[in-house]
Amino acid sequence: MSKPINSVVSKVISVLGLLALMSPLNVTAQSDEITFHKDIEPILQRSCQNCHRVGGVGPMPLVTYDQVAPFAGLIEYKTGLRDRAGAMPPWYMEKDIGIQDYKNDPSLNDKEIVAISTWARSGTPKGDIADAPEPLVFDDSLKWTAGEPDLIVRTNSVTKLAGTADWWGEIDRVPVSIEQDRYVKSVEVVEVNDVNNTTGTGRDTVGGRYIFHHMIWSTAELDEDGNRVEESVTGWPVHEVGRNPDIFDPEGGRLLRSGTYIYSDSVHLHSNGQDTTGHLEIGFRFHPLGYEPKYERVSLGLGNGVDISIAGNQDNQELHAYTVLEQHTKFITFEPHLHAPGERMCLEAIWGYTVETLACVGYDHNWVRGYAFEDDAAPLLPKGTIMHIVGYMNNTETNPNVPDPRNWQGSGNRSVTNMFIDLGMRVKMTDEQFHEEMENRRQVLNLSPNDHVIGCPLCGAPLVAPMAGNEEASD
């Protein structure tokens, strides 16, 4: 017996209507799906592949889908650490406090971290190859991240045997081969050794690829006995494992004198697990001939390396250090330096009744990072400002960098003893330069009387009290 025609038509219409309703949802679901080629690969290219590729220093390449998918869970975990020790990429600036504008920032934003987690937990869908970005091409003959140097100075090679004790001491002086004094806009130190970057040494840490833990160095003329002529000394940022290049303020270049030598009486070598021969290459990039710096560097004793006391088996221990700015000062970088139990450092500026946090940074002793403020975000602080750093120490078994948390720790050079310093770069300014910098900041940021600039307590003063500013100008 045939069914009534109106019943059949009704069911067909119902099915077609249901399909019509479902189809847009299905298309939307497909377009919203997090896939490797569309969503994950661009993140890896920007923030990971410089190290995680064949020939890079990362422990595994993260270029193709087949290379990345097996490590999806680990990548989710490492990126989810955000600003704590062990996080990848190794950038530990906290994003919920202080200044947030930095140069060469490879960190992931919240949306990217969530995308990686979603992708890892949804079966690592590959997606359409048509969505993939163009593959990056790396030139392994270029080892300089700040740009090709104008001058490269090489130290003499040294050999560190597998399993031997750490060594501290001097290395040979090396001449700086330039015919005239030059101002330097950036300096970068890299270790070149015979470790096979493909096979590694069996050590998982960054230091496992290298034998130089650090070098404190300067350039100076030498007297007939080979000693430094003190008035000729120029200090340079310390080289440490995992350190990024040092780029000086564009108007505060540092002087490299002709006739000087690379001088270091504080080099730390360590075994990486296999016999290794290596040397350091120091790359200087110069300002053009005729350049004269507008600003001079200023050294601040902001830290404590003398009377540190860290109890065993205790977390959340704090260290504090203060100094007062004797000149108007522009902060170029913030570089927290702690040792094994260090987990975090914050930088504060105290001006009048205002206590302001400029930055808080997680700390990982495997990666010693400097954080360069963007030009229009660099702190501009008046003389008389009290600078304050706070170090947070974790001397418990939850800190994998601590070999035995039962031990009390004091001050010292070794990683199992402690330092607590801000090694950042700063320049000093005259009254006129300070006011000029603040006026430029007001113009660039288009500040109104209701705006506040972190790290520049007086930037808004002429906007809030213009009459007072005019009276001072007339005086």
Where are these predicted regions, by residue range?
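Short acidic/polar inter-strand loop motif in beta-rich domains
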Residues: G123-G127, L269-Q274, Y392-N401
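Short, surface-exposed beta-strand/strand-loop-strand elements in extracellular ectodomains
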Residues: G200-L222, R344-Y353
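Solvent-exposed, flexible loop/coil segments flanking beta-strands in beta-rich domains
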Residues: A132-R203, G273-P341, T398-A473
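Bacterial N-terminal signal peptides
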Residues: K11-P24
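Noncatalytic modules at the cell exterior or secretory-pathway interfaces
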Residues: V184-K185, G253-H270, P379-N395
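Extended, compositionally biased non-globular segments
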Residues: V324, I332-S415
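Long, hydrophobic/aromatic-enriched structural stretches that serve as scaffold segments
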Residues: A87, I216-S266
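Aromatic- and Gly/Pro-enriched helix-to-coil junctions and flexible linker segments
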Residues: T28-V174, S186, G259-D265
